[in-house]
Each structure stands twice: as C-alpha cells, then as structure tokens.
Amino acid sequence: MLTLNNISKSYKLGKEEVPILKHINLTVQAGEFLAIMGPSGSGKSTLMNIIGCLDRPTSGTYTLDQIDILKGKDGALAEIRNESIGFVFQTFHLLPRLTALQNVELPMIYNKVKKKERRQRAYEALEKVGLKDRVSYKPPKLSGGQKQRVAIARALVNQPRFILADEPTGALDTKSSEQILALFSELHREGKTIIMITHDPDVAKKADRTVFIRDGELVLDERGDISHA
C-alpha cells in the first residue's frame, strides 16, 4: 500500500548539509499495524512528517497505492493529507470553541460534504469511539482520554487509507492510555492500517510490527513482541 524507497532528508545549516534521514526503505501493507520507535533526535518525527505529506524528502520516492505522490504540487499533497491520512496527535489539536461533533466534522467541511451527511458521519464516528453522550461537549469539558477519542473519530471520519498517530498516549494517564490503545487494537482488527510513532515499548507491543530508527537510519524491523529489543 505504502512504500518509501531510498528516502533521505537533510537541512542546510550555513554552508553545511545536515542529514536527518538516510536512505530509508519502508513498506507498509494494507491492514498492518506498524510502530515506529526511536529516541529523541533519531529522525522519527521527520519520517512521520514525510509519511503524512507534511514535508518532502530531499531525495527518494514515496508511493501510496502505486501512485508517486511526491510528483504532485503542495496543493495535491494537501488533498492527499485530507482524503487519505487520518492524523492523531499527542496534544489532540482540537478547536476549543467547537463541540466534539463540530471538531469531527472539520475534515468533511474541507471535502465539501453536505451538512446533513457530515453531521451523520460525525455522530457515527463519535458513537464508534464511545462518545455518543459527549457530542455537544467542548474540549475544555472533556478529559484527556475523551479528547483523544474525539481526535480518533476525526481521523476516521473521511475513511482514510491509513491512520498516522504521533505519540497518541503521550499526554494521557495510565488508564486512559490503556483505553486508547485498546481502541487502536479494535480498529486494527477491523482492518484499519495504523502507523504509530512512539518511544514507549509497552505502546509498541500493541503493533504487529515495529521498526526502530536511530541517527536517521532504520536499524531494526521486527514482528511480534519487541520487549527484548
């Protein structure tokens, strides 16, 4: 479904070229639950931004469903982000003045979905994540775990090709973290493709495959329990 081929990324610091990612090769199959692990400064955030079409590599190719998406202009990348990728962030990225329902509707507004349909789809997404009794609540009235559920509902509402989650439990307590991870596991069982960025081995255990990035390079690719790594 998704293939990164020889992806490199560097930034200029004065006259010096500073490498961030070095010749990354990665394939993610449809329905796979992949965790990407690495320490701070390893390049995993840059890799996430490239996978999420938020940044472009310096070199290499990125294909999604056999389409070379890097050939498109920035406007085309924005369209891919909205239609093909469901984002879940550590800090939720909810608009505080909007209700849970209105926050979930936002991606469909960008897609020009009619009001009646988007309301119905947003309600169904919130019901799926267990928040049908919180549709009219605004983020300041929700717990951290509930905010993340709203964010997951928003990620699902456009029926994306895959979900890209950046440290989705990083701002949550233990109980809320377990509930959110259980929800991701349920979505995976339903066939959703999930790519999760994390530094926590306990979180990565929920995935069926884990890749490790260090100093801008993929150094390990494992399936199953990675507690020994």
UniProtKB/Swiss-Prot annotation:
InterPro entries named among the record's database cross-references: AAA+_ATPase (IPR003593), ABC_transporter-like_ATP-bd (IPR003439), ABC_transporter-like_CS (IPR017871), ABC_transpr_LolD-like (IPR015854), MacB-like_ATP-bd (IPR017911), P-loop_NTPase (IPR027417)
Q: Give coiled-coil spans as residue ranges.
A: none
Q: Which PROSITE patterns does this UniProt record tie to the protein?
A: ABC_TRANSPORTER_1 (PS00211), ABC_TRANSPORTER_2 (PS50893)
**SMART domains tied to this protein:** AAA
* GO CC, any one term: plasma membrane
Where along this sequence does the record place binding of ATP?
38-45
What span is annotated as the signal peptide, if there is one? none
Keyword Ribonucleoprotein among record annotations: no
Domain ABC transporter per the UniProt entry, residue ranges: 2-229
Gene3D superfamilies, per this entry?
P-loop containing nucleotide triphosphate hydrolases (3.40.50.300)
Q: What is its EC number?
A: 7.-.-.-
Can you provide one Gene Ontology molecular function annotated for this UniProt record?
Answer: ATP hydrolysis activity
* A GO biological-process term: transmembrane transport
PANTHER family attached to this UniProt entry: ABC TRANSPORTER DOMAIN-CONTAINING PROTEIN (PTHR24220:SF692), IMPORT ATP-BINDING PROTEIN (PTHR24220)
What protein does this entry describe? Uncharacterized ABC transporter ATP-binding protein YvrO
From the broadest rank down, the organism's phylogenetic lineage runs:
Bacteria, Bacillati, Bacillota, Bacilli, Bacillales
